[in-house]
């Protein structure tokens, strides 16, 4: 008896509009019903698919041919990598839109991972002051996190995601089958964001992950699908409460302030985003222990589960002052003070600046050259 394909439907509620998250299998395969799932969310007759040089050979043809039966379809294929998440790539998207005289009736489709999703969303938010877009995330990281919630943007040489907009998609279609073509390193990077949700919101989920990580890393799509569904539901609930990150949504950035320091310092693309977040979560846990919130056993638990996912648990050597300067560019800085997401306990996070700055310096010094 054949194993039934995984399928789940969720809804994200936002001030601008509600939209579905469809988590499924084999949606982008040739002769699939993908177009029937996406087409209802395409307004107008114009479609621009934005993808990259890695994803295009795998999935572009099937998607493009299906949509061409109903729409005028153009394609923009960008280089692959975090180092290309910049204004030059955004201009390439604009150039295609302008060259074919697409207008406000266009729908952009992001076919790729977090970088493609962030850039396509930002292009959609800014082209003609805003057009629709759809997310088709093809990496675990983008399926569980970046494709949901409307954060879009690009990097600046002095800081990650410094330029962007909140712009919600019309739908998110997460095809679990795309994870079969994901390199092991990219899968692990996505697991960092999955583990993040457990650490900040749900200690029971952390226990579930410890038990199920081997199956996830062996590409058991049913188990991966359950993890993606849980993470998307967590994020949808948070976005419904705080769409523009003025409060509780900031907790989703656990590990990211430290992680962005790593990415910016080492050069975009040197460390994958999930790898940097993993090391950053350990640093945040270490600071939480110094404050007196976590025990040494709990910090060891954080390190253990990240190691199980083949993720780094120590950052590269960075001078303390350099790290502090980079943290000063963080979007959570308020009135000149660095605010961090820390753990009160496993499964409970808080955004705070109520800590001795010397404790932060101590954590950074542990890994300084």
Curated annotation (Swiss-Prot):
The keyword Lipid biosynthesis does not apply. This is 3-dehydroquinate synthase. It catalyses: 7-phospho-2-dehydro-3-deoxy-D-arabino-heptonate = 3-dehydroquinate + phosphate. Pfam families: DHQ_synthase, DHQS_C. GO terms for molecular function: 3-dehydroquinate synthase activity; metal ion binding; nucleotide binding. The gene is aroB. Catalyzes the conversion of 3-deoxy-D-arabino-heptulosonate 7-phosphate (DAHP) to dehydroquinate (DHQ). GO terms for biological process: amino acid biosynthetic process; aromatic amino acid family biosynthetic process; chorismate biosynthetic process. Keywords: Amino-acid biosynthesis, Aromatic amino acid biosynthesis, Cobalt, Cytoplasm, Lyase, Metal-binding, NAD, Nucleotide-binding, Zinc.
């Amino acid at each position: 008896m054949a194993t039934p394909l995984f399928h789940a439907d969720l809804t994200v509620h936002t001030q601008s509009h509600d939209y579905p998250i469809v988590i499924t299998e084999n949606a982008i395969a040739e002769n699939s019903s993908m177009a029937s799932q996406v087409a209802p969310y395409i307004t107008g007759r114009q479609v621009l698919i934005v993808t990259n040089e890695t994803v295009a050979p795998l999935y572009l043809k099937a998607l493009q041919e299906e949509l061409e039966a109903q729409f005028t379809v153009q394609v923009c294929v960008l280089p692959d990598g975090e180092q290309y998440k910049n204004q030059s790539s955004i201009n390439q998207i604009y150039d295609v839109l302008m060259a074919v005289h697409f207008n406000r009736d266009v729908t952009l489709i992001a076919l790729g991972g977090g970088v493609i999703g962030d850039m396509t969303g930002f292009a959609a938010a800014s082209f003609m002051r805003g057009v629709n877009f759809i997310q088709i995330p093809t990496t675990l990281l983008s399926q569980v996190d970046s494709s949901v919630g409307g954060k879009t943007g690009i990097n600046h040489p002095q800081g990650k995601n410094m330029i962007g907009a909140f712009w919600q998609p019309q739908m998110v279609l997460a095809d679990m089958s795309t994870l079969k073509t994901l390199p092991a390193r990219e899968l692990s990077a996505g697991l960092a964001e999955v583990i993040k949700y457990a650490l900040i919101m749900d200690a029971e989920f952390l226990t579930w992950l410890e038990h199920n990580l081997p199956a996830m890393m062996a590409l058991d799509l049913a188990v991966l699908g359950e993890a993606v569904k849980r993470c998307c539901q967590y994020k949808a609930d948070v976005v419904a409460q705080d769409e523009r990150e003025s409060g509780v949504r900031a907790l989703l950035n656990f590990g990211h302030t430290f992680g962005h320091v790593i990415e910016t310092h080492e050069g975009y693309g040197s460390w994958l985003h999930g790898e940097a977040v993993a090391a950053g979560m350990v640093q945040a846990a270490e600071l939480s222990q110094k404050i007196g919130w976590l025990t040494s056993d709990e910090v060891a638990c954080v390190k253990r589960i990240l190691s199980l996912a083949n993720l780094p648990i120590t950052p590269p050597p960075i001078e303390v002052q350099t790290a502090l300067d980079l943290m000063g560019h963080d979007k959570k800085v308020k009135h000149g003070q660095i605010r961090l997401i820390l753990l009160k306990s496993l499964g409970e996070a808080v955004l705070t600046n109520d800590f001795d700055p010397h404790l932060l310096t101590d954590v950074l010094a542990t890994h300084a050259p």
